[in-house]
Amino acid sequence: MNNTDTKIIKVHGKNIDNFFQNIITNDINNLNTENPLYTAMLSPQGKYLYDFFILKEENFFLLEANANKVNSLIDEIKRYDIRKDISIELQENFYTKVIIKESLVKDY
């Protein structure tokens, strides 16, 4: 993500874990409630479309994506929701903070 202006998307619904496992490049099983994963979506031909961070909460996911591309990312996710089992909400009142652990700062 080159642009530092990001937006947060909340995605929830039936079989949401399996849904994301089938449309992102990273393994959803590596995701937990403590640390986000950096991942991407590709076209069926393998062409890069979007990259974002994904964080799992108890029964939903939060995606942090480039603000300039967030609406088209939402549209792309909706294309894969054939059964209309998921809900996607742009979180207008959410914002991003970066916190770096002291142990990581010492390495730089």
PLM feature spans:
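Basic, glycine/lysine-rich polyanion-binding surfaces/domains
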Residues: 1-108
